[in-house]
């Protein structure tokens, strides 16, 4: 009867919460499997529960349990035994909280608040006698980290696993390479010595291991892509090629009459037992592989490889292209292993011819340099040619004497030797040409031709050069002249300066004459008024002397003249003018005229 009474005393919301907790606990016990995201269903349900009711759910049931456990059956007062047991028994909620806090759970952002386990509380309420045994039961909450998902593995473990896988794959690749080397040694006939063969094959594992260690990630990825093809026994020429290829250097055969081993400058292709793998080794690796051989040098030589079969890729495959990490690595896969055909190549003789071409070119170049002696065309200082008869060569461009001697001196000598026998007796090789450049700024070269009898005169050289004028233009010589023309040109420059000086002197003289004439004219203008004054005075005297014959007429004329002379003087404008001297003369003449008039009147 105690349980119904207890249940009746509890408020209705608490009953609903307890019922929900009991159902959730039963469901959690039945279904405790991780979901697709790694979280269990119970953990999701616990997270979805409202947090507002958790304090009420955690405190009230404990109080109710404590009160119900302390009540005596059949009475409303607690007994002494129940009080003692209640004092000795620790609170259930706080003990659970201590257990959860003491565990190694890391709830991440929700570590400040612990979700209580409702199923344990419901079980303790149904059977209070089993409450002390609850701590020994395993918790239903999964031990997980909300900040980090449980399926996430540590980064160090992943790196360790990747390193182990890479090491295993490298070991497998080394074993395959060793097998391929053995097959190559069996299939390929080598005409060199055994020691040279061993030295040639020695650096191949180190080279392959270095290439595989440089790109572990690319090796793993590429090996997964080509796993099916590798199991079939065929290694396809693909992106796996840098790690699966066998870099090696073929020891060259001894050339007849030469004790020097020569190596091919580019990469050599070796067949790998019918496999479509091509290995290319740089020249530096080949040199390191052939250090122990006798009389090895760095010259390029022919590599007779007619006895070596060569794998030819199908026509559908693309040409290997150079990549940024692996030079000369093909980026495309062939159609399949069955499409590749390993046939003896007929281009090996062509390869031999290509390897012999550099030697032929060098020999031709050396042969072209040997026929003429470099001392036949020399460059001298300008002071050494000052007292000799030389020819001035006007060049199309400003070129140095030494550069012209190296590149065009041989042709100039050949042209001169072709023409010289027509004019002079002599053999080829007896002539010497001396060149000099007087100034770095001018496009001129001085040439002196010296034969068995000494320096050839300039007139003879000019006559000889006239026959090869067009050929001279081809080697950059525009025209030519002699020293006399050069001296005439210098005198012409001097005469130009003389004429300029003469012109300046003439202009100065003309200016001086003009200035003198101007001064003379000015002086003449100043002297003219004095001459006019003297002549006018004489005329007046002549008139005065002739007045006795006709005094009346003279008086009238004199009075008119006086009237005309006094009017401008009264106005005052003609006193300072050019006719002021007539007014002055009139004023001086007045007393005389009056005396004459008086005398005439008296008469």
Curated annotation (Swiss-Prot):
Entry GO terms, CC: plasma membrane
Composition-biased stretches (Low complexity): 196-216
Ranges per topology, Extracellular: 29-499
Subcellular location: Membrane
Sequence ranges on the Cytoplasmic membrane side: 521-603
Compositionally biased tracts (Acidic residues): 156-187, 592-603
The record's account of how the chain is modified after translation: Glycosylated; contains chondroitin sulfate. Displays sialylated O-linked oligosaccharides.
Extent of the signal sequence: 1-28
Record membrane topology: Single-pass type I membrane protein
Location of Sulfotyrosine modifications: 93, 113
Membrane spanning residue stretches: 500-520
Modified sites of kind Phosphoserine: 569, 594
UniProt cross-references to Pfam families, sorted A to Z: CD34_antigen
Compositionally biased residues, Polar residues: 240-266, 302-314, 339-349, 558-570
Region described as Disordered: spans on this chain: 53-92, 124-368, 558-603
Subunit structure: Homodimer; disulfide-linked. Interacts with SELL, SELE and SELP.
PANTHER family: PODOCALYXIN-LIKE PROTEIN 2 (PTHR15594:SF1)
Function per UniProt: Acts as a ligand for vascular selectins. Mediates rapid rolling of leukocytes over vascular surfaces through high affinity divalent cation-dependent interactions with E-, P- and L-selectins.
Assigned protein family: Belongs to the podocalyxin family.
Protein name: Podocalyxin-like protein 2
Organism: Mus musculus
Chain's gene name: Podxl2
């Amino acid at each position: 009867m105690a349980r119904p009474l207890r249940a009746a005393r509890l408020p209705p919301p608490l009953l609903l919460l307890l019922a929900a907790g009991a159902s959730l606990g039963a469901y959690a016990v039945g279904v405790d499997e991780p979901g697709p995201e790694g979280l269990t269903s119970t953990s999701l349900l616990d997270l979805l529960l409202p947090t507002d009711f958790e304090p009420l759910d955690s405190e009230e049931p404990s109080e109710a349990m404590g009160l119900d456990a302390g009540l005596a059956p059949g009475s409303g007062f607690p007994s002494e035994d129940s009080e003692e047991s209640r004092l000795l028994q620790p609170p259930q909620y706080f003990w659970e909280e201590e257990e959860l806090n003491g565990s190694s759970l890391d709830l991440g952002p929700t570590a400040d608040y612990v979700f209580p386990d409702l199923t344990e509380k419901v079980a303790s309420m149904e059977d209070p006698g089993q409450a002390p045994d609850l701590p020994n039961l395993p918790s239903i909450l999964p031990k997980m980290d909300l900040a980090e998902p449980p399926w996430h593995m540590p980064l160090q473990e992943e790196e360790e696993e990747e390193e182990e896988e890479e090491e295993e794959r490298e070991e497998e690749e080394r074993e395959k390479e060793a097998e391929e080397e053995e097959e190559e040694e069996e299939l390929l006939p080598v005409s060199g010595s055994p020691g040279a063969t061993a030295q040639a094959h020695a650096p191949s594992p180190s080279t392959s291991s270095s290439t595989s260690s440089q790109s572990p990630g690319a090796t793993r990825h590429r090996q997964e892509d080509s796993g099916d093809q590798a199991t079939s026994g065929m290694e396809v020429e693909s992106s796996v090629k840098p790690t699966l290829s066998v870099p090696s250097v073929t020891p060259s055969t001894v050339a007849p009459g030469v004790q020097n081993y020569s190596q091919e400058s580019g990469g050599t292709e070796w067949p790998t037992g019918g496999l479509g793998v091509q290995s290319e080794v740089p020249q530096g690796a080949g040199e390191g592989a052939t250090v122990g051989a006798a009389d090895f040098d760095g010259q390029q030589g022919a590599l007779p490889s007619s006895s070596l079969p060569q794998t030819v890729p199908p026509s559908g495959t693309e040409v290997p292209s150079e990549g940024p990490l692996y030079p000369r690595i093909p980026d495309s896969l062939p159609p399949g292993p069955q499409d590749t055909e390993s046939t003896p190549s007929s281009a090996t003789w062509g390869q031999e011819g290509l390897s012999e071409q550099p030697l032929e070119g060098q020999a031709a170049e050396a042969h072209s340099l040997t026929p003429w002696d470099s001392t036949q065309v020399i460059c001298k200082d300008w002071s050494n040619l000052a007292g000799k008869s030389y020819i001035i060569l006007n060049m199309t461009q400003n070129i140095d004497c030494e550069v012209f001697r190296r590149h065009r001196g041989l042709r100039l000598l050949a042209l001169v030797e072709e023409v010289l026998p027509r004019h002079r007796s002599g053999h080829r090789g007896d002539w010497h040409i001396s060149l000099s450049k007087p100034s770095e700024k001018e496009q001129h070269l001085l040439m002196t031709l010296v034969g068995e009898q000494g320096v050839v005169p300039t007139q003879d050289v000019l006559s000889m050069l006239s026959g090869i004028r067009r050929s001279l233009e081809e080697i950059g010589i525009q025209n030519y002249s002699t020293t006399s023309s050069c001296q005439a040109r210098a005198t012409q420059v001097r005469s130009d300066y003389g004429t300029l000086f003469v012109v300046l002197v003439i202009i100065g003289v003309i200016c001086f004459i003009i200035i003198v004439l101007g001064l003379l004219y000015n002086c003449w203008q100043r002297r003219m008024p004095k001459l006019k004054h003297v002549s006018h005075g004489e005329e007046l005297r002549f008139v005065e002397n002739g007045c006795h014959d006709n005094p009346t007429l003279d008086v009238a004329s004199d009075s008119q003249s006086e009237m005309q002379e006094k009017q401008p003087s009264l106005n005052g404008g003609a006193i300072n003018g050019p006719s002021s001297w007539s007014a002055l003369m009139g004023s001086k003449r007045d007393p005389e005229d009056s005396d004459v008039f008086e005398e005439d009147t008296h008469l």
